[in-house]
Amino acid sequence: MAKEIILTGDRPTGKLHIGHYVGSLKNRVQLQNSGDYRSFIMIADQQALTDNARNPEKIRNSLIEVALDYLAVGIDPLKSTILVQSQIPELNELTMHYLNLVTLSRLERNPTVKAEIKQKNFENSIPAGFLIYPVSQAADITAFKATTVPVGEDQLPMIEQAREIVRSFNTIYGKEVLVEPKAVIPKGTIGRLPGTDGKAKMSKSIGNAIYLADEADVIKQKVMSMYTDPNHIKVTDPGQVEGNTVFTYLDTFCKDTETLEEMKAHYSRGGLGDVKVKKFLNEILQAELEPIRNRRKEFQKDIPEVYRILKEGSEKAREVAAGTLKEVRETIGIEYFNNIF
């Protein structure tokens, strides 16, 4: 029986943080090690350039950081194909063909794109490359004939747009060439881990993220300065657990649920200080992140080897994408010279 094919990845705009780790990276490693899937993991540098075109150095520098984070958490290049988007030129031609099947109004209606346009203050001047990136994403997915795409809920509209493109292509040309992917929200993952300041999203620019590469003292400093319940002023005050960032992290990382529930009850009725709770969280995070940090340092000793992994993975992925593009070109009827020379 053929394995399911997975495509997933990240934009290289900085080092990866623990939000990425619990939101997707741990799940990727589990899927990889299950042996049930063929995994393609993309570093989407071209997509990152759609809103960083004037700062390409940021993307170049982040590429190797993301690769190191992948290897550190356990993504194995012998089991998963790690690729760099810009090294697969076939993706660009597929994007061009798919653009002919999508209207401008449909792109503008995509809820994910609309939200990101507002977030990035692009309302008055939307880069064309940014607006069409859902089509580029459809090219990424279909190039490798991915059957499964693990995503968060906010990315579901992107997968639906890819499915529409697949259906349009197959219907117009009367041939089932492209595979319609299904979106899967990984079980056991949290939605989005808030920043250490309690804001909805971790962000490098805000400085509210704990990175996989952070040293132990940096992690401790970030944990001890985390946002808690502003009304929990004295130890004896009853504290609010719900919406308390420290407890949100504990819900995510603490495996001792009995101890955690006792701690929540104690905090809620009063008598348990924030410092003690934060120290408990720090111990848990240190135990989780120390092995990852140590593996990262080992890979960092041989950066040329990391680039070799990326190059070999990209070459392997390109062979697959080239096969899909050939099918697409033949189906459209633009392989003009095949039967002549």
UniProtKB/Swiss-Prot annotation:
Chain positions recorded as ATP binding sites: R11, P12, T13, G19, H20, G152, E153, D154, L193, K201, M202, S203, K204, S205
Keyword set, alphabetical order: Aminoacyl-tRNA synthetase, ATP-binding, Cytoplasm, Ligase, Nucleotide-binding, Protein biosynthesis
InterPro entries according to UniProt: aa-tRNA-synth_I_CS (IPR001412), aa-tRNA-synth_Ic (IPR002305), Rossmann-like_a/b/a_fold (IPR014729), Trp-tRNA-ligase (IPR002306), Trp-tRNA-ligase_bac-type (IPR024109), Trp-tRNA_synthetase (IPR050203)
GO cellular component: cytosol
Domain of life: Bacteria
Catalytic reactions of this protein: tRNA(Trp) + L-tryptophan + ATP = L-tryptophyl-tRNA(Trp) + AMP + diphosphate + H(+)
Uppermost EC category: ligase
Residues annotated as binding L-tryptophan: D140
Coiled-coil residue spans: none
Positions occupied by motif 'HIGH' region: 12-20
Subunit structure: Homodimer.
NCBIfam families hit by this protein: trpS
Protein name: Tryptophan--tRNA ligase
Organism: Clostridium longisporum
Record lineage: Bacteria, Bacillati, Bacillota, Clostridia, Eubacteriales
Gene name of the encoded protein: trpS
